Amino acid sequence: MVSEAISKKEIERVKFESKDLHKPDEYWREHLTEEAFYVCRQQGTEAPYSGKLLHNKDTGLYHCTCCQSALFSSENKYDSGCGWPSFDAPINEQVIRFLDDFSHGMVRTEIRCAACDSHLGHVFEDGPKTTGLRFCVNSVSLIFNKK
């Protein structure tokens, strides 16, 4: 659902555009903080309840830390109680890449930025009735741009 705060036209303007942003680790080490490199490039996870965007309630768009591609809208953010920012959907399906993740003895679906392959978090099928999905995203993998 798109409210008046973020118009459908505005979301259409930030639709995924193919970018050649698959850069070597050396590039990312120089341009990211140590924590952002660990999470975004090495598929790490920030500690639960530690992210600066967890309790953000401002209106705007959430962009990829690595390439600034728009990924999520505040309209789709909700408090899942899991300790990480949660969304019921991305701004559109093309901005997210889905990968099977069998690490840590679990079966999960990893989510990555489709433009630069940055690790964002995971998606689970225990979300709200709107979509049934919970996109559980590390705060450090996102930059928030207030409307």
Swiss-Prot record:
Ranges where the MsrB domain occurs? 25-147
Required co-factor? Zn(2+)
Which SUPFAM superfamilies does the record associate with it? Mss4-like
Q: What is its EC number?
A: 1.8.4.12
Q: Where does Zn(2+) bind?
A: 64, 67, 113, 116
The organism sits in which domain of life? Bacteria
Entry's PROSITE patterns?
MSRB
Instruction: Give the reactions, separated by semicolons, that this protein catalyses.
Output: L-methionyl-[protein] + [thioredoxin]-disulfide + H2O = L-methionyl-(R)-S-oxide-[protein] + [thioredoxin]-dithiol
Endpoints of the signal sequence: none
Q: What Gene Ontology molecular-function terms does this entry list? A: peptide-methionine (R)-S-oxide reductase activity; zinc ion binding
One cellular component term (GO) for this entry is: cytoplasm
Q: A GO term (biological process) for this protein?
A: protein repair
Identify which residues the record assigns to the active site.
136 (nucleophile)
What note does UniProt attach to the cofactor annotation?
Answer: Binds 1 zinc ion per subunit. The zinc ion is important for the structural integrity of the protein.
Disulphide bonds in the chain: none
Alphabetically ordered keywords of this record: Metal-binding, Oxidoreductase, Zinc
**Which protein family is it in?**
Belongs to the MsrB Met sulfoxide reductase family.
Record's protein name: Peptide methionine sulfoxide reductase MsrB
